């Protein structure tokens, strides 16, 4: 006889809410980072331009992992533009040309904010789903590393 392993549905509740919020925050982060990437001006342009692409790639990959985890648990990930705009925990990025120093500071705050939002859910998520908790810990750790690198660039 083969044992069947099932995963409890996460269409509502703590795990689903944590994953959905992480999804919209990570999606907003990668969209804002790409917008800044196109519009930064000033000394240090090239290194920040390249680093923003790293943030874009990392946040996009993390958002995909989060969405796929939510779907695997029976949820329906919602990464639509309207949902991201309405529920993201990030402040909007201003339009137009952006000064390099302001973008370093702004994205240090943004990456730290997304990490903090994820970390705030970890105890509750861990009580229900260790695997999701592990996924979120890895994402938060990477975001904290990026925030540190951005802050260090301002020193």
Please state what every model-predicted region is.
Residues 13-32, 66-84, 99-113, 155:
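Phosphate-binding glycine-rich loops and adjacent basic patches that engage nucleotide phosphates
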Residues 23, 30, 37, 56, ...:
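A structural signal for well-ordered alpha-helices, especially hydrophobic packing surfaces
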């Amino acid at each position: 006889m083969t044992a069947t392993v099932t995963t409890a549905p996460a269409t509502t509740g703590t795990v689903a809410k944590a994953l959905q919020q992480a999804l919209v925050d990570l999606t907003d982060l990668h969209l804002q980072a790409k917008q800044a990437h196109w519009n930064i001006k000033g000394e240090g342009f090239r290194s920040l331009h390249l680093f923003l692409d790293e943030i874009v790639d990392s946040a996009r990959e993390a958002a995909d992992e989060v969405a796929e985890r939510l779907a695997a648990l029976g949820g329906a990930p919602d990464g639509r533009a309207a949902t991201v705009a309405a529920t993201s925990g990030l402040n909007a990025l201003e339009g137009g040309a952006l000064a390099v120093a302001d973008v370093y500071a702004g994205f240090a705050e943004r990456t730290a904010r997304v990490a903090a939002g994820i970390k705030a859910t970890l105890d509750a998520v861990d009580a229900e789903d260790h695997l999701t908790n592990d996924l979120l810990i890895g994402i938060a750790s990477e975001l904290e590393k990026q925030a540190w690198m951005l802050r260090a660039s301002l020193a």
